Amino acid sequence: MNAADAAYDADLLVIGGGSGGVRAARMAAARGARVVLAEAGGMAGLGGTCVNVGCIPKKLYSYAAHYAESFEESHGFGWHGNAPRLDWGRLKENRRNELARLNGVYLKLLV
């Protein structure tokens, strides 16, 4: 028998590993249900759209953008010197690292 022909015995199939899917799976499992969670991955993996391509990446980029205004406004408060330059590659790398960390948090919630 190959994996495609295998029979699965579960009480609940949760489709999607976003916040709601992970919560539903955990709540059911805590009550003794045998749970299978199906997550296709792709753009929105564990944690769902908000964590992977929506809310969290947007907030990270928005937060980074506000620093430019803060550096500019700091001159009026006695700060001197040139504002640092944005390293776009590093910002993207840090975003990827934070999303990987959050995906790991969701994975730990399931095991």
Residue ranges and their predicted role:
Residues 16-19, 40:
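Glycine-rich Rossmann-fold phosphate-binding loop(s) that bind the pyrophosphate
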Residues 1-2, 22:
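A generic local structural motif
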Residues 2-3, 8-9, 27-33, 37-111:
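Glycine-rich flavin
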Residues 18-22, 45:
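Residue-level detector of alpha-helix initiation sites
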